[in-house]
């Protein structure tokens, strides 16, 4: 069951990885009349806004199921991440893909599929739910790093870096809970083990502070 659920999630993640790049490459990278952003930067902003919603929505629902404080605490942080991205969307006069969508509803089909897969696994057990937290945070870090590489705007990079910092802290929290439950070291689920170990072997960060 575990191998099957992980395989399903990896397929969903593969689709999610290609979604923003496909959308960006599928249209001209010209500057728009409404913003100073490239089409790639716009696509990434829209995608990241909904990806943070995936995290928030999953954590809210998993808290309802398992009553683990880590889900409630991090869901609140994910709302802050969503708010930061909404501020950028408004600054650059871009439409909000999350507008009007209830918990568990997404405009991007790849993210809808990812949410559904994560929820399916997260309902299996408290252990699976915590692993879902690790999957989400590792995925966020991978996607944020890619968006930073594709961005040429300081304000966007600053926001992404702050979110990346938050995701590192969230991964530390989920890893701590998993290690306490299993007695085993945290195993990477999306990133390389080397990347994950570097994060887990460093202390919690004060994000957004210089």
Question: Where are the language model's segments positioned?
Answer:
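Bacterial N-terminal signal peptides that target proteins for export
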Residues: 1-9
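A periodicity- and composition-biased signal for non-globular, repetitive helical segments
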Residues: 9-10, 176
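N-terminal targeting leader peptides, primarily classical Sec-type signal peptides for secretion
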Residues: 10, 24-25
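Bacterial N-terminal signal peptides
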Residues: 10-18
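Sec/Tat signal peptide C-region and signal peptidase I cleavage site
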Residues: 19-23
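All-alpha RGS (Regulator of G-protein Signaling) helical domain and cognate RGS-like helical scaffolds
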Residues: 26-210
């Amino acid at each position: 069951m575990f191998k099957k659920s992980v395989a399903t999630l990896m397929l969903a993640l593969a689709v999610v990885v290609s979604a923003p790049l496909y959308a960006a490459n599928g249209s001209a990278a010209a500057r728009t009349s409404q913003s100073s952003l490239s089409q790639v930067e716009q696509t990434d902003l829209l995608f990241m806004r909904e990806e943070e919603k995936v995290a928030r929505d999953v954590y809210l629902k998993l808290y309802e199921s398992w009553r683990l404080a880590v889900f409630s605490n991090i869901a609140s942080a994910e709302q802050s991440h969503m708010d930061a991205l909404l501020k950028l969307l408004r600054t650059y006069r871009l439409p909000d893909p999350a507008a009007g969508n209830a918990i568990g509803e997404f405009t991007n089909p790849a993210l809808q599929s990812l949410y559904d897969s994560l929820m399916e696994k997260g309902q299996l057990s408290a252990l699976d739910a915590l692993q879902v937290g690790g999957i989400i945070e590792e995925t966020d870090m991978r996607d944020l790093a890619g968006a930073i590489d594709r961005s040429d705007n300081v304000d966007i990079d600053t926001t992404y870096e702050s979110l990346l910092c938050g995701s590192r802290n969230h991964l530390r929290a989920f890893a701590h809970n998993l290690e306490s439950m299993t007695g085993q070291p945290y195993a990477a689920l999306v990133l390389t083990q080397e990347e994950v170990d570097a994060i887990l072997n460093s202390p919690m960060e004060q994000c957004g502070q210089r």
